[in-house]
Amino acid sequence: MPRSLKKGPFVDDHLLKKVDAQNERREKRVIKTWSRRSTIVPEMIGHTIAVHNGKQHVPVFINEQMIGHKLGEFSPTRTYRGHGADKNAKGSKKK
């Protein structure tokens, strides 16, 4: 169920303060955050935000198409290594 429009988008205060401070100083430095739940708002356009995926911070460059999405959507937490391959299928064939 989506969030009510009258409430507005959720953005952690500490993240929004960092973005606003960089906008005032006209800086574009990487901002580290653990807040995967924050919604991307127009003030973040052009910034690179390093979103934590549980192991490391993944840099995400924010553009116009990302507005309204969550930061966690762009930092995958699981790695897919493929299904187990048959041991005999790669090398030699069975006789």
From Swiss-Prot:
Check the record and name the SUPFAM superfamilies matching this protein. Answer: Ribosomal protein S19
Give a Pfam family name: Ribosomal_S19
Keyword entries, A-Z: Ribonucleoprotein, Ribosomal protein, RNA-binding, rRNA-binding
Q: Where in this chain does the entry annotate a coiled-coil region?
A: none
Which superkingdom? Answer: Bacteria
Cystines in this chain: none
Under the heading HAMAP family, the entry gives:
Ribosomal_uS19
Write out the function statement from the record.
Protein S19 forms a complex with S13 that binds strongly to the 16S ribosomal RNA.
Family the UniProt entry places it in: Belongs to the universal ribosomal protein uS19 family.
Q: Which NCBIfam families match?
A: rpsS_bact
Task: Output this protein's name.
Answer: Small ribosomal subunit protein uS19
**What gene is it encoded by?**
rpsS
